[in-house]
Amino acid sequence: MEKILKVKSFLCDGKRVNLIEPISILVKNNIVNFVTAENSEYGVYVSDATEEGIKKKIIARLCYLYKGFAEVTDISLLMFLDSYTDPVLLTGMLRNAWLSNIESVVPENEKS
């Protein structure tokens, strides 16, 4: 299974995060690859490769980046294309790329 998903907004802690540009996500077998505007890319393994499982993993990851975590404990989940890149630094760069792409954050119970 291989497909490209485009994410324009996502829910995080009851808030809808709207993006300026959609994020491209390549799903191939059990790996979800996130690609930033700078073409930085990293993959996350998904044990539940159903559509629902993949969707949950994507939303969890975007929410995680949005909230600003770049903890070393999470690095085991990330597989980097460039093994020479400092994973903590790259996670921070990815987070900054996501944050610079946020257009608005609206409580989910408000009508937009």
Which ranges hold each PLM region?
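A short, exposed loop/beta-hairpin motif centered on an aromatic-Gly-Thr core
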Residues: 40-53
